[in-house]
Amino acid sequence: MKVMECQTYEELSQIAARITADTIKEKPDAVLGLATGGTPEGTYRQLIRLHQTENLSFQNITTVNLDEYAGLSSDDPNSYHFYMNDRFFQHIDSKPSRHFIPNGNADDLEAECRRYEQLVDSLGDTDIQLLGIGRNGHIGFNEPGTSFKSRTHVVTLNEQTRQANARYFPSIDSVPKKALTMGIQTILSSKRILLLISGKSKAEAVRKLLEGNISEDFPASALHLHSDVTVLIDREAASLRP
């Protein structure tokens, strides 16, 4: 696990975008694993900038997203389908037919998880997977206690995760209680993982991660089992770093 400490969130975002861009330049038809939430937004802004100023092309890439809320249609402003289109896809030249996100509005969520896992597997190993981390160590929506052998599955979101995401919704009662997420084993199948951590609220999670103890009680600790993980942390997130 390689750890890079950045002075600011902006610097973190620039480095993450450059690493992702280099992956695309080396392999124009790369499979990118994408994340949502507040932390990756700066990376997406920087990738859009590279597209506009350096002619970085996304024309041949394929994207697979980590997760999606259950029960939200793709045009719901709080869905991750909407998030990805709004923050990234509509600003670049990628093909919509090559964007893959779990269908949280499927009639049979378990069947949708199996379909999505098979889809990700059929694309071959993801070339680079972007990740964020929750205060409780969750990656994707894999909450504490999730098996490291898990594949794409339906998860019941714990109260801490729902509270953290409530800022995007009218109220806590509007936050879905379930989601579909790639499993930890699915994530670990990626060739390279880029973990982005920003802000004082994540400092305790950084401390636990870098202590190196591997436990299903702290899902992100599974990343120690992967051979190519880069962790980008800003100064605030690094404030309790061991």
Curated annotation (Swiss-Prot):
The keyword Lipid metabolism does not apply. Induction: Expression is repressed by the HTH-type transcriptional regulator NagR. Pfam families: Glucosamine_iso. It is an enzyme of class 3 (hydrolase). Disruption phenotype: Deletion of the gene has essentially no effect on growth on either glucosamine or N-acetylglucosamine. The gamA-nagB double mutant cannot grow on glucosamine or N-acetylglucosamine. Monomer. This is Glucosamine-6-phosphate deaminase 1. It comes from Bacillus subtilis (strain 168).
